[in-house]
Amino acid sequence: MQSKHRKLLLRCLLVLPLILLVDYCGLLTHLHELNFERHFHYPLNDDTGSGSASSGLDKFAYLRVPSFTAEVPVDQPARLTMLIKSAVGNSRRREAIRRTWGYEGRFSDVHLRRVFLLGTAEDSEKDVAWESREHGDILQAEFTDAYFNNTLKTMLGMRWASDQFNRSEFYLFVDDDYYVSAKNVLKFLGRGRQSHQPELLFAGHVFQTSPLRHKFSKWYVSLEEYPFDRWPPYVTAGAFILSQKALRQLYAASVHLPLFRFDDVYLGIVALKAGISLQHCDDFRFHRPAYKGPDSYSSVIASHEFGDPEEMTRVWNECRSANYA
């Protein structure tokens, strides 16, 4: 009898870790996912389409707004406004961007605008206050600056652009660890006043992926948070371009859609709700291409993985000298 109990216990001890491993890897979770095509709806708790949900953006106030310098005439509508998502402590990156791809006076015949989007961090508020007075390019809202508040940061930037700076023809949203060629951005848009891009433009690197159910992942998503087996198509939030009309329609649609933890997925949901198609462009590089001199970046519009401001500055200067930036 004792022998049978021992065998049973041994089997349990062997099977239990396997069950835990299967659960931890999300294999059981996948069995309970809902088919996206048949069941997708958002907000998750509103199947009626009553519009009673809210993004909650109206609860957040701006602490600092841009007061723009005299680098370009204030009364001239911008061809392109760059809204750069930056962490409060990344002042060196912001300074490098001001001197390189974010320089508003880069082109004599094209008006550019630059705005840095920030949350708050107690130990850096004095520095941000000085930076705002010195450069006039800070849009800071009253929320904690943290990775999973990027959706909030993006949408508060979009709210400001939609409500208070809505004369720009196009808007580039981009992270502060990117290399950008403003020249290639303008080439993509069409250099003249008549753009060859659609009136409802939402462009960047488009992904079609599924939620990660691995519980050890930073990007783990539970069924309670998102029960469907794939995401809607989305543009990676590190760098994307919106036309003025697309920005206004996206923001208007977002007002009744609760924020989601991942900003790119959230924008994909909003675009789906607003009926805005996504345009894929390979020259928005999610993974950094090997830099082998300026010619290797001749067509790059934006590239991730430039967290070192000195390196970004060097690459940008070389590409500018070769007429690629």
UniProtKB/Swiss-Prot annotation:
Pfam annotation, one family: Galactosyl_T
Top EC class of this enzyme: transferase
Transmembrane segments: 8-28
Residues modified by glycosylation: N149, N166
Top-rank lineage group of the source organism: Eukaryota
Predominant place of localization: Golgi
GO cellular component: Golgi membrane; Golgi stack
Keyword Methyltransferase: no
Single GO BP term: Notch signaling pathway
Keyword Glycoprotein among record annotations: yes
Alphabetized Gene3D superfamilies for the sequence: 3.90.550.50
Function, in words: Neurogenic protein essential for the development and maintenance of epithelial structure. Required in the germline for establishing the follicular epithelium and for determining the dorsal-ventral polarity. Collaborates with Notch on the apical surface of follicle cells to mediate germline-follicle cell adhesion. Brn has a role in chorion formation.
PANTHER family listed in its UniProt record: BETA-1,3-GALACTOSYLTRANSFERASE BRN (PTHR11214:SF349), BETA-1,3-N-ACETYLGLUCOSAMINYLTRANSFERASE (PTHR11214)
Name of this chain's protein: Beta-1,3-galactosyltransferase brn
Organism annotation: Drosophila melanogaster (Fruit fly)
Lineage: Eukaryota, Metazoa, Ecdysozoa, Arthropoda, Hexapoda
